[in-house]
């Protein structure tokens, strides 16, 4: 079987397994073992199998296409995937001002197709389709691996939910604490649906399908952030996350409608029939036409929509003269180039890009819609680890990267400024926070700003590379913080201190995470994963400054200053928690290392946080992979 047939089948199975787990747990629930403990085994087995299938797809892709060139082109700039198999979109010099024009581009590989057509409404086909390239495969491996570790971790962390629970944070009107039944099976039920939704976004082949799973991710986050629904803080946090994201989604709908009304399709790549003939041109190939060497070009549909008065005038003139409709169409086609040169339709391209990015601003907690993410820590720590690393917040950055070929230079400038403001603002707040999970929450907001900044200044590879490295070390950091909270029953770092003696596994795996997020390394020799991805971002910002002095200085100093703040607040967190002497002896005396089912996933993630950025001669690295 060829890779073009095998890969969609593998990834479809990997995508649907968490859905099957969700359905089984919904139907059987508490009947799955004693107190529903079997729900965790089913959910964990499903996501582990998804990872295995994704890894097989990864190996198949490597075996077929191999690696390319030097990591990240030394600047994090890379071709942008667009189109079906032999089509791609390249971020050109005119869109960023710093990429050298390539006379003839060699497009990266991608596969697109339709699994099922739900219905046709005029020219609009609503389909369940796929779009698979190197980014899709990398995201599948990352999401399923991290989710697998979190599932194992959650088996230990959520064990209290196997029995009746006394919630000491909820006081009833009679002064008693809340007593309720455990919700162990329900937690894994939501977790499975969450993973299914995120994988649906990644594999989706059209904007409509993305939007469905985009909203499903939002619903799952509402359920999981508000898991302790009786707590007012959790209820408010869930509502806040849901409502703030709807603000961004309103803009996303506007962007979708601009694309559909002018281009007549929701598909990313071109769709072909059984004979290989293109039956529907996708968004990417219309915006970055292969005939135009994949340079950004206002599509004919947008030009016609913007010049509708001229089009109507031509049609009326030909009808009045008794000409055939084809004569009017030929004149319209001959006028398109002139209208495009006059700027017709370009504003539609900008509106579509800004609209799509508005949805990404909400999901990835960018300024000014960043306010929901720090409160998302009200959910159980495994939820925080998943939300802040591989699923919800990653979706916004992923979609920005996926739509990259569509973004005009003005849109990329908006992306860069949003990222720069977000990364500095969140980092300054993290410096003074005392709640261990809140520090990590603001750290997530700041790192997402880094990714958006990279994308805005033309560093597609750098931004996507940091998305993947960040997912590993941030999930590790959140799970370590959960291990601390599980042992000490407090989130406040001033009440901790000296815990490395009681929790060595947690302490030193968290140290690895801290070193990874600050980008520690020995220059020109070796470093933690963040060393490579952050270096690519800062190098890209410097290159942008060199070619765009008007805006570039802001982005470079934001990236460099944010890196310094990150180093400060992360080591402040580690020292306050694990170093020094105990500041609250009651907390210290009751502290203990987490069970093996909780700290072994930390070790696995620590290895990836250390080495996911490495690249060896003859072995494909993540940056090389994304270059495809």
Where are these regions (language model features)?
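Interfacial/capping segments of alpha-helical transmembrane domains
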Residues: 58-114, 269-280, 526-527, 531, ...
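Short, strongly hydrophobic alpha-helical membrane anchors
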Residues: 1-10
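Hydrophobic alpha-helical transmembrane segments in multi-pass integral membrane proteins
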Residues: 83-194, 311-312
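Short phosphate-coordinating micro-motif centered on Lys-Gly-acidic
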Residues: 215
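Hydrophobic transmembrane alpha-helices and their helix-loop junctions in integral membrane proteins
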Residues: 149-166, 170-210, 219-594, 608, ...
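Membrane-interface helix-loop junction between the first two transmembrane segments
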Residues: 24-41, 158
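N-terminal signal-anchor/start-transfer transmembrane helix
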Residues: 15-30, 361, 365
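Hard-cation-handling environments
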Residues: 591-628
């Amino acid at each position: 079987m060829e890779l073009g047939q095998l890969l969609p089948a593998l990834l479809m199975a990997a995508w649907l397994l968490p859905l099957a787990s969700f359905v089984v747990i919904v139907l059987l629930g508490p009947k799955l073992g004693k107190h529903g403990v079997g729900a965790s085994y089913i959910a964990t087995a499903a996501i582990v199998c998804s990872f295995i299938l994704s890894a097989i797809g990864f190996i198949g892709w490597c075996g077929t296409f191999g690696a390319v060139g030097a990591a990240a082109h030394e600047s994090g700039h890379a071709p942008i995937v667009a189109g079906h198999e032999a089509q791609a979109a390249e971020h050109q010099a005119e869109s960023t001002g710093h990429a050298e024009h390539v006379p003839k581009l060699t497009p990266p590989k991608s596969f697109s197709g339709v699994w099922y057509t739900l219905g046709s409404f005029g020219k609009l086909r609503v389909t369940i389709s796929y779009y698979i390239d190197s980014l899709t495969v990398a995201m599948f491996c990352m999401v399923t691996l991290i989710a697998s570790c979190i599932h194992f971790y959650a088996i230990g962390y959520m064990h209290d939910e196997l029995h009746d629970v006394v919630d000491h944070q909820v006081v009833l009107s009679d002064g008693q604490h809340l007593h309720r039944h455990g919700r162990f099976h329900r937690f894994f039920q939501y977790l499975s649906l969450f993973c299914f939704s995120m994988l649906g976004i990644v594999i989706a082949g059209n904007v409509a399908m993305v939007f469905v799973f985009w909203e499903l991710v939002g619903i799952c986050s509402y359920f999981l952030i508000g898991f302790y629904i009786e707590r007012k803080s959790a209820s408010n946090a869930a509502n806040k996350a849901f409502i703030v994201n709807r603000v961004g989604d309103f803009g996303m709908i506007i962007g979708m409608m601009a694309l559909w009304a002018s281009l007549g399709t929701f598909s990313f790549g071109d769709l072909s029939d059984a004979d290989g003939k293109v039956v529907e041109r996708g968004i990417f190939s219309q915006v970055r036409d292969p005939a135009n060497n994949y340079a950004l070009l206002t599509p004919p549909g947008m030009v016609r929509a913007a010049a509708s008065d001229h089009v109507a005038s031509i049609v009326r003139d030909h009808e009045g003269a008794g000409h055939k409709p084809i004569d009017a169409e030929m004149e319209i086609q001959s006028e398109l180039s002139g209208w495009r040169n006059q700027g017709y339709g370009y504003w539609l391209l900008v509106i579509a890009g800004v609209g799509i990015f508005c949805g990404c601003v909400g999901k990835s907690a960018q300024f000014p819609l960043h306010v929901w993410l720090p409160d998302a820590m009200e959910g159980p720590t495994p939820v925080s680890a998943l939300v802040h690393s591989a699923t919800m917040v990653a979706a916004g950055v992923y979609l920005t990267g996926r739509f990259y070929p569509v973004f005009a230079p003005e849109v990329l400038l908006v992306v860069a400024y949003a990222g720069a403001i977000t990364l500095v603002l969140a980092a300054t707040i993290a410096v003074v926070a005392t709640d261990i999970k809140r520090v990590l929450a603001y750290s997530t907001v700041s790192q997402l700003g880094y990714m958006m900044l990279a994308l805005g200044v033309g560093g597609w590879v750098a931004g996507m590379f940091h998305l993947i490295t960040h997912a590993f070390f941030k999930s590790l950091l959140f799970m370590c913080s959960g291990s601390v909270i599980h042992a000490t029953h407090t989130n406040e770092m001033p009440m901790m201190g000296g815990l490395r003696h009681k929790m060595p596994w947690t302490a030193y795996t968290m140290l690895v995470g801290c070193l990874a997020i600050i980008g520690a390394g020995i220059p020109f020799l070796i470093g933690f994963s963040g060393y490579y991805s952050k270096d690519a971002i800062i190098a890209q910002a410097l290159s942008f400054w060199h070619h765009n002095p008007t805006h570039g200085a802001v982005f470079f100093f934001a990236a460099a200053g944010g890196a310094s703040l990150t180093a400060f607040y992360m080591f402040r967190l580690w020292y306050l928690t694990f170093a020094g002497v105990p500041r609250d002896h009651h907390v210290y005396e009751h502290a203990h290392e987490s069970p093996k089912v909780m700290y072994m996933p930390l070790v696995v993630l620590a290895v990836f946080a250390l080495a996911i950025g490495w690249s060896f001669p003859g072995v494909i690295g993540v940056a090389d992979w994304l270059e495809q």
